[in-house]
Amino acid sequence: MPIHHAIVHLIEKKPDGTPAVLHARDAELGDSQAIENLLADLNESYNAKNKAWGFFQGESGAYPFSGWLGEYLEGDRDFVGFSREAVEHLQKLMEESNLSTGGHILFAHYQQGMTDYLAIALLHHSEGVAVNESLEVTPSRHLDLGQLHLAARINISEWRNNKQSKQYISFIKGKGGKKVSDYFRDFIGCQEGVDSPSETRTLLKAFSDFVESEDMAEEQAREKTETLVDYATSQARIGEPMTLDALSELMDDQQPRAFYDYIRNKDYGLSPEIPADKRTLNQFRRFTGRAEGLSISFEAHLLGSKVEYDEERDMLIIRQLPTQLKDQLKRRKD
């Protein structure tokens, strides 16, 4: 992972309304194994978080970040100057937010594959212990990437090459509530463009409809469900969106356009690229069971809506039966 530029600044700030104090670094971080390890660990932690996706607000006095980033990329200002301008803006926003807490601010411009990214993260320390060369236990401070709550990643290549994109920025949804992370989102100047949970739910609904329309056997439906969930999970793990083209090809290598064409013909309104929402995906695993000539299979998210389990009476109640099954039952009754 080539790292083009990286720098760290420090903002001291407590969530009590006290002024934010900036300690700015005046030179980039040099190449080292430590910074490579830091960025690798940061990406691993970041990819595991639930994120929102969006795009830059129109450049203005309230949202100047995209303008500074553009000037840096065009060579009109160096990386240190860009990061200094940005962190001073962040300092002001922190002072306006009583809930904000300071920390070390990492700016890193790096490349992964053929794609350029800018990562920005607010890092905090944790107190721990270590054993020194004299085999004594001593206090030790380290960056705690497990407590990463405020961070954003900008896909620079997507931003510059695809003007229609509305999902080239991702940022962590703060655990402390919307107001805690609002100032950081405003710092980036990001407007949410894609509702990841909603898009994921729509994709899963389209998949369920597709499986029903194809009248797939239970085993085939289960295999395709696993294919979808595995692909979506792997993309979420590396912080990349799913693409409908790639997913359709994975579904059926003999008819690689079948699922894609079904989605487009039914007009589900899905974007070509969909950020996977892991919580939504986890509800989509299938329940299956066989006994004495009976075979039951349904997606986990249907439990509690179309499927109800009555444990005391050892019963499953199924609502909205498939049309084909109802027709068979009616013919048998007649």
UniProtKB/Swiss-Prot annotation:
A Pfam family the protein falls into: NA37
Keywords for the protein's UniProt record, in alphabetical order: Cytoplasm
InterPro entries hit by this protein: Nucleoid_associated_NdpA (IPR007358)
Gene Ontology terms: cellular component: bacterial nucleoid; cytoplasm
Compartments (UniProt record): Cytoplasm, Nucleoid
Domain of life from the UniProt record: Bacteria
Molecular function terms, GO-annotated: double-stranded DNA binding; single-stranded RNA binding
Broad class of the protein's primary localization: cytoplasm
Similarity-based family: Belongs to the YejK family.
Annotated protein name in UniProt: Nucleoid-associated protein PA3849
Annotated organism of origin: Pseudomonas aeruginosa (strain ATCC 15692 / DSM 22644 / CIP 104116 / JCM 14847 / LMG 12228 / 1C / PRS 101 / PAO1)
